[in-house]
Amino acid sequence: MFPYPTLNYPPMAPINPMAYRDPNPPRRRWRPFRPPLAAQIEDLRRSIANLTLKQRAPNPPAGPPAKRKKPAPKPKPAQAKKKRPPPPAKKQKRKPKPGKRQRMCMKLESDKTFPIMLNGQVNGYACVVGGRVFKPLHVEGRIDNEQLAAIKLKKASIYDLEYGDVPQCMKSDTLQYTSDKPPGFYNWHHGAVQYENNRFTVPRGVGGKGDSGRPILDNKGRVVAIVLGGVNEGSRTALSVVTWNQKGVTVKDTPEGSEPWSLATVMCVLANITFPCDQPPCMPCCYEKNPHETLTMLEQNYDSRAYDQLLDAAVKCNARRTRRDLDTHFTQYKLARPYIADCPNCGHSRCDSPIAIEEVRGDAHAGVIRIQTSAMFGLKTDGVDLAYMSFMNGKTQKSIKIDNLHVRTSAPCSLVSHHGYYILAQCPPGDTVTVGFHDGPNRHTCTVAHKVEFRPVGREKYRHPPEHGVELPCNRYTHKRADQGHYVEMHQPGLVADHSLLSIHSAKVKITVPSGAQVKYYCKCPDVREGITSSDHTTTCTDVKQCRAYLIDNKKWVYNSGRLPRGEGDTFKGKLHVPFVPVKAKCIATLAPEPLVEHKHRTLILHLHPDHPTLLTTRSLGSDANPTRQWIERPTTVNFTVTGEGLEYTWGNHPPKRVWAQESGEGNPHGWPHEVVVYYYNRYPLTTIIGLCTCVAIIMVSCVTSVWLLCRTRNLCITPYKLAPNAQVPILLALLCCIKPTRADDTLQVLNYLWNNNQNFFWMQTLIPLAALIVCMRMLRCLFCCGPAFLLVCGALGAAAYEHTAVMPNKVGIPYKALVERPGYAPVHLQIQLVNTRIIPSTNLEYITCKYKTKVPSPVVKCCGATQCTSKPHPDYQCQVFTGVYPFMWGGAYCFCDTENTQMSEAYVERSEECSIDHAKAYKVHTGTVQAMVNITYGSVSWRSADVYVNGETPAKIGDAKLIIGPLSSAWSPFDNKVVVYGHEVYNYDFPEYGTGKAGSFGDLQSRTSTSNDLYANTNLKLQRPQAGIVHTPFTQAPSGFERWKRDKGAPLNDVAPFGCSIALEPLRAENCAVGSIPISIDIPDAAFTRISETPTVSDLECKITECTYASDFGGIATVAYKSSKAGNCPIHSPSGVAVIKENDVTLAESGSFTFHFSTANIHPAFKLQVCTSAVTCKGDCKPPKDHIVDYPAQHTESFTSAISATAWSWLKVLVGGTSAFIVLGLIATAVVALVLFFHRH
């Protein structure tokens, strides 16, 4: 257990101490004299033995030497070969000592693993991992530790574990777990465990009962799994284990057919005698020796949890070894026999058929159905033979080749497998199922109504299994044994009258009993006599019609069918394993051709060419999901509008894709007017049209007003000449329209007059036009370009505190950057980026619901009497007694009465076999927690994938820093108060409460778990009167509400959730919802700051934007020239929100330049760049991006995309200034003329 010391010197042979010599030695015992030749041979033998490397053999017992007839000559080397020494004794093979790594793991396991004691023996183990003690739930007993035994353990039945927190004194001395499990070998108590293909396996025979709870360790002594059980798979044993995934969530991996490795022995009962279930007593011993007693033993232990062990022991007969484990499963059905039952359609009419169809199940994918019949397959009358089938030929059992069997729907089916009462076939779609066989010239068939459909997997409706594609979860029927949870109910057959046992002998009715059988008879001549006989018996009746004889068959079971009469008295039940059970598997589904994608400005065009109907779903990643869902059946083209918030589309079985729009354009915001108009029209068509219409209206109004004013001025000028007859208007006056021959005061005189008489009016007259012009121009300038100037104040400024607080958007992948400033220290760069966010609500499982199965036991037929119903604890149990259903001496019951015969029909509901893999869980959702995984960098410290709670209270240690995040600005969740989880999808659905389900709707079958006994059902089950003369139990029932809900459930939450939420399970959560913002507060330690004297001082900064593409992911490149006091590193940051800098810091020389990348949404970015303690402003022009649609979100805000370029503003000023000139000139001319006329009149 402990490491051995290492020798640092050559090993030496041990030195023997000097032997002790007695001063008075005893006298030697007398020994017989050996001849000299014998002494020489003995010396030679000893010499050869000493030369060998093997251990010396013990000396033979002393005795007289062997007598020889002739003295042997002197030994020679050749003779030495003939006289070989006796073979040396073999060394006892010692186990190799474990290596250092193994010894370390063994010591860790022994110190942290505690036995669980039950009745004085070890029943399993409990281990202490990560501050908790884990105990297998199936292991009964008490932990052999006083402190751990006093802990109150919590049960986690889904993981088959019990767990509890260890005392504080033991928390520092516990094992640690890990989720890293690379393929290879790991350490276990019994040796190496191989991990490959996500499975832990050991050689067969290693480990077994009593090893449940032992941990599996890696080379560092960390726990990678806890063993719960195992199952033999050929030469290796697959282990059932509990592991942890990358997120620290417990995961249970249980191979099919695994058995818990608890050492406790379960006891069974037979005639008030208890015995181990795997060792039945010698009286029944096994089925071959005592069939009836064995069946009785199984029936009495029907509800035992070790029924499988008892059944396995009864079939194997203990001492008898089977060839393979699979044979045990096949030989189980030797306990049963075929039977004849009612068939609704035998090809011509209703009949009692030897291959009646009991049930058809089509819950698997790819058109595979499972058919249960009254015939048996894979068995002959004398044993197991997969090439044969057996059926009841009248009263006897007959076997024929399986090649005579056929199954068809709308076309012949392909036989996949068969065993027992079951057939597994892959059939084409159809409305009926027919099973039949040929027995020489006889042809037997049975047809029932059942709709068979090809159920595709995924989001594509293909009709045939593809050769290649993508693997998706699906349902299949297994071809091998499943030992738990799926049984077919059996019972000993009822009595059926047999006319062949009755005959007339000496005018009396004689009952002939077959050898080794028993016959029950019932005679009425005229007194009623009945009894059981095992030998021939002669009655007093004279007519065969007066007697009935029943052959008692208590050596075989038959299926508990509603088409067979039930046996008399208390009929016990047995059960056998269903050979083909539904399981979760992986199926290959088709993959539709990739769509041809075409990008335009804010438009995504998909050219789709499906081979079969394919589902296309889309949703917006903003606050309004606006989901769409359509099946595409033929080649088509669809268009979708894409915004900066993003769009997600899913085509068929392809994974979802997300795209985002970029602010691209066709024109040039820095070009000629028509290019500017084209650019803005492509981006903002409505705004551009309104702006152009406004400009045109201004121009038209300006021109009309100017012309009107000029015409008005001209009229004022020429009016005096119009009043004078034959007046000649001078040509110059006609042209200028304002010159008159009379003299008047000019403008200077008028201004002089106003200055001398009314100075206030002088200043008003002079300044009002100028003020109006300035006000108009300023209003226009503020309207078009002052918006960005206002928004420039938004952004994260450097924090001048040791504790930095800020608010960052709740968007995964968008980093928050800032410079944390502290007096006397150089600024420290801070970056926080969300890697993952999770909204985890608290849930309460109300119930699970699934498809139900109607169980119809064999009816009770009472001849010449009445029976009554008794209540039974079955869900939706129905019982009813019908009278007068069998005619006189009818073949099924052979009653002597007519109207007095009665039948008691029963029916109830239970879970279908598919419930274990196909069920929905109804949860109530309450307020939960928000968690985030962040990457944080401050200074030279970088911390990856730190998990924090977004609640504003719980601090997280990030190195030496303390971080507090939250709470979210919006208390929002995509989950309603009630959700339904089905498979890997989640649905918001208002389900009924437990115990209030309605027939035909969701929740018509409810239970707390998939195996609990608290089953509630409401299926509107009604029993109907059976048809006279036919043993059957007709009933009506509402269709399954679970199946109806599956058809009408709509789109899952993953396709309709807003804000781009991704819904996941285990636990139920919403990931990466881009909603609201997150406050952050971080305390940065002093060690992250550097004295300002130790950092470079930067001066003479000059920034030039060399290349810039706005609205693109870091599409801007700028170069900064500088001079530095010394070489070193400086953080760079832009405190404004105009640009986001990609680099966090730069390396500076004493002089030179450096280049950085930035991302911006402004076409004229002007942002402040801070380098160490200095700052510089970077300005430039940006061109639009070429890509309209990209597959990554923007790394900047979109607050500045509406800004007008400087070039566009210049053209606008020219346009507005040109049109205003006409108005100004007209106003000036009008004003001058008005003044002239005013002064002329006065």
Curated annotation (Swiss-Prot):
| Chain positions covered by the region annotation Host transcription inhibition | 37-70
Which keywords fit this entry according to its UniProt record?
A: Capsid protein, Cleavage on pair of basic residues, Disulfide bond, Eukaryotic host gene expression shutoff by virus, Eukaryotic host transcription shutoff by virus, Fusion of virus membrane with host endosomal membrane, Fusion of virus membrane with host membrane, Glycoprotein, Host cell membrane, Host cytoplasm, Host gene expression shutoff by virus, Host membrane, Host nucleus, Host-virus interaction, Hydrolase, Lipoprotein, Membrane, Palmitate, Phosphoprotein, Protease, RNA-binding, Serine protease, T=4 icosahedral capsid protein, Transmembrane, Transmembrane helix, Viral attachment to host cell, Viral penetration into host cytoplasm, Virion, Virus entry into host cell
Q: Which residues are glycosylated?
A: N272, N935
Cite the residue spans of the region called Transient transmembrane before p62-6K protein processing.
717-737
Where does the chain cross the membrane? 689-709, 760-780, 781-801, 1219-1239
- Which residue intervals define the domain Peptidase S3 in the entry? 112-261
**Signal peptide range:** none
Disulfide-bonded cysteine pairs: these are C850-C915, C863-C895, C864-C897, C869-C879, C1061-C1073, C1103-C1178, C1108-C1182, C1130-C1172
Q: Which residues lie on this side of the membrane: Cytoplasmic?
A: 710-744, 1240-1242
Map out region (E1 fusion peptide loop) in residue numbers.
885-902
Q: Which reaction does it catalyse?
A: Autocatalytic release of the core protein from the N-terminus of the togavirus structural polyprotein by hydrolysis of a -Trp-|-Ser- bond
Q: What is this protein called?
A: Structural polyprotein
Origin organism is: Eastern equine encephalitis virus (strain Florida 91-469) (EEEV)
